[in-house]
């Protein structure tokens, strides 16, 4: 086991400059070399079992409508939602970039901070690890907007039907790692959730000693330091209008 650990570390050291070079050439996330180095350092130490492996099943388990309109924000999972959820649910996706066509999914290019949707339109909204990027300059070509996430939450509230639910996941922890991710804590979420009813909250934290994710109390998740703990924690919320 010790030999495997040493070999893994050596492999990561060898791979690192090539990972950075690929990111710098593509520039599909960060634009500056400094930021791409930071992102590569974080990615190399990322858990084998990634946060999306928990977020997607969590969202699918908790969605409780059988029919109606669903909107997925920052979507990369329109196909999965269409394939897994009841067929009487109309799947809509919203993304600031062009999306690959998905049969049976209505795709809209736009910004969740300000949309053309009518008020009280959607029965539920999913926003999976997207809120933390809104208005954070330096990644995905986003322009700085200090209150971008607040604007997004207000717009989602506007377009949700009364009684409709928002299924939201965000990185959780003690300190932002900009421009990679904004991290949330109780103080931030309480401001963002103003007007919503908090129906459910869960927190997951990566245990670097054993390489597993654990369900933890909010206070434990809030103490997470990304670089020290090898990854951020996750906050998973069900909110109702």
Give a label for each model feature.
Residues 8-64:
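Class I SAM-dependent methyltransferase Rossmann-like catalytic core
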Residues 69-114:
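Class I SAM-dependent methyltransferase SAM/SAH-binding core
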Residues 113-126:
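A short acidic, Gly/Pro-enriched loop at the edge of an enzyme's catalytic core
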Residues 124-130, 136:
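A short beta-strand submotif of the Rossmann-like class I SAM-dependent methyltransferase core
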Residues 143-162:
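A short glycine-rich, Lys/Arg-flanked "PGG" loop and its adjoining helix->strand segment in the class I
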Residues 163-171:
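Conserved beta-strand signature within the Rossmann-like core of class I S-adenosyl-L-methionine
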Residues 181-203:
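Short alpha-helix
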Residues 214-241:
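Core SAM-dependent methyltransferase catalytic element
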């Amino acid at each position: 086991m010790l030999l495997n650990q040493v070999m893994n570390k050596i492999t990561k050291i060898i791979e690192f400059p090539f990972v950075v070079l690929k990111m710098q050439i593509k520039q599909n996330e960060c634009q500056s070399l400094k930021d791409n180095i930071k992102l590569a350092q974080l990615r190399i130490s990322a858990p084998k079992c990634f946060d999306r492996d928990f977020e997607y099943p969590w969202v699918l388990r908790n969605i409780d409508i059988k029919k109606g309109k669903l909107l997925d924000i920052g979507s990369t999972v329109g196909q999965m939602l269409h394939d897994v959820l009841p067929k009487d649910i109309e799947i809509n996706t919203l993304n600031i970039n062009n999306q690959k066509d998905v049969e049976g999914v209505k795709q809209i290019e736009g910004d969740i901070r300000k949309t053309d949707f009518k008020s009280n339109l959607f029965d539920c909204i999913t926003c999976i690890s997207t809120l933390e990027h809104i208005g954070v300059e330096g990644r995905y070509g986003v322009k700085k907007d200090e209150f971008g996430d607040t604007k997004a939450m207000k717009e989602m509230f506007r377009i949700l039907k009364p009684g409709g639910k928002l299924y939201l996941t965000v990185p959780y922890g003690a300190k932002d790692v900009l421009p990679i991710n904004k991290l949330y804590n109780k103080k931030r979420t309480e401001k963002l959730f103003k007007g919503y009813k908090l129906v459910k909250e869960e927190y997951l934290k990566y245990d670097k000693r054993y390489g597993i994710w654990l369900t933890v109390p909010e206070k434990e998740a809030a103490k997470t330091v990304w670089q020290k703990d090898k990854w951020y924690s996750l906050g998973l919320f069900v909110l109702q209008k």
